[in-house]
Amino acid sequence: MATASTTTVYGGDEINAIVLDPGSYTTRIGYAGDDFPKVITSSYYGQVKNDKKKIFGESINVPRANYDIKPILKESIIVDWDAAIEQYQYYFDQQLKVVGPEQPILITEPIWTETSYRQQLVETFFENFEFSGIYLAKSPTCVSFQQGRSNCLVVDLGHDSVSVTPVIDGICLLKSSMKTNYGGKFLSNEIQDYLIDTKKVVMEPSFKIKSKIPTTYPDPPKYELKNNNTIPTSSSSSLSQSFLEFQNEKIYHNFKEILEVPEKNSSSGTTTTTTTTNKDSSRLFELPTGQSIVIDRFKIAESIFDPTIYKFTNSKLSFPPNNGEISITQANEYRPLKRVRKNDDEEEDSNQSTPKPEVNIRGISQLISHTLSNIDIDLRASLANNIIVTGGVSLISQLTERLYLELSNNNPGLKIRLHAVGNSTERINQAWIGGSVLASLGTFHQMWVTKEEYNEVGVDRILNQRFR
């Protein structure tokens, strides 16, 4: 692999920057300027009890006795730094052949990172990997660059979280952003509750199945497990709960692929579910044991818009109420110019004189409508006309159509326009692709924070002045 020399790292087009997009479920790594990441890997790792070795990539799916699966990130924030460093080092060395002192790195980050986390992130990549330059880019900003829309509203439906972020002039308005946990993991918990706790079906990962005979629920499954001493049977305690849950998550992921958001009709300013036949909503889903079960694909998908609609049998799987309002404290908050600027006292008095009813839970359309209603009126029309929908959960059938209808009904004074990439591979990699576009711009060389600047001014000043 050709690498850029130190003198060309900040000279424009010749740099060979690395782009890292760490997500809760998947991590993406590649070269700036490429269309897609070179590495797309799980954000989990495996580790055998009493063994320091960490296992990454597809190898984590190999069953082992006393073997746990652990997350590296939660809500797109690193929670296991040792594992993160080891995983990134593995892919930097083995697949990308990175030469840290000769290459800069752009790292995407969610909008809700705290200052202490960002400090550790910068210090880790300068000290442990010795990159020549670093830039931290907000994920919504990267998505906006991928779409070529400097002013937009980025709606990201991810695994651990759902977020709505206004982006103005390529900069995220943190105080106007919203986030809930009603994303892919929330849907997985509903599916788990439906299959295991409500229907009491037998869950066996596919790697344990030797043969099976098709059956239909409520008839019991007919299958034979592999007779292999290296693969413990269901009654064995050798397979850890975390490993089994990780394998079951793949079943839930396949389940989510057949979900569909039900249509809605507008009636007197409200939305009501249209009458659908059981044939429309019901689908057969085959489990690894060969047992097929009829599922209502509308009911679970509806929880994206109304998180209260599904009633959990197992309360431990339910999520606490979340209205999406978050408190983000980062220095140098960007404030776009307004047509008429009020002073702080007038704004405070205005907010106090208009009390708002308390809302405990918000679905996706409510999050977006609430964000639009709270944004400056001069920005509202532009953002409503440039709503970018991204993330794996957004691929659920009919989601964007339903979202457009609800937003149009809830915001009659605005022209709603959704932008969702038709290519599913491109949509789930949208933040990385945007980072690739951003880091490959000839004018971006002045944005890199060098190792020399880091040593000279320190991480605190870098965060305050260079990264927004």
Swiss-Prot record:
Any idea where this protein resides?
Nucleus
Composition bias type Polar residues, residue spans: 321-332
Q: Among the record's GO biological process terms, what is one?
A: DNA repair
Q: How far does the signal peptide extend, from start to end residue?
A: none
The annotated region (Disordered) lies at: 262-282, 321-360
Q: Which domain of life is it from?
A: Eukaryota
- Which InterPro entries did the record assign? Actin (IPR004000), Actin_CS (IPR004001), ATPase_NBD (IPR043129)
Q: Does the keyword DNA repair apply?
A: yes
Q: Name one Pfam family in it.
A: Actin
MF annotations from Gene Ontology: ATP binding; chromatin binding; histone binding
Recorded GO cellular component terms are: Ino80 complex; NuA4 histone acetyltransferase complex; SWI/SNF complex; Swr1 complex
Please tell me whether the keyword Ubl conjugation is annotated for this protein.
no
Assembly, in brief, is: Component of the NuA4 histone acetyltransferase complex, of the INO80 chromatin remodeling complex, and of the SWR1 chromatin remodeling complex.
Its biological purpose is as follows: Chromatin interaction component of the NuA4 histone acetyltransferase complex which is involved in transcriptional activation of selected genes principally by acetylation of nucleosomal histone H4 and H2A. The NuA4 complex is also involved in DNA repair. Is required for NuA4 complex integrity. Component of the SWR1 complex which mediates the ATP-dependent exchange of histone H2A for the H2A variant HZT1 leading to transcriptional regulation of selected genes by chromatin remodeling. Component of the INO80 complex which remodels chromatin by shifting nucleosomes and is involved in DNA repair.
What name goes with this protein? Answer: Actin-related protein 4
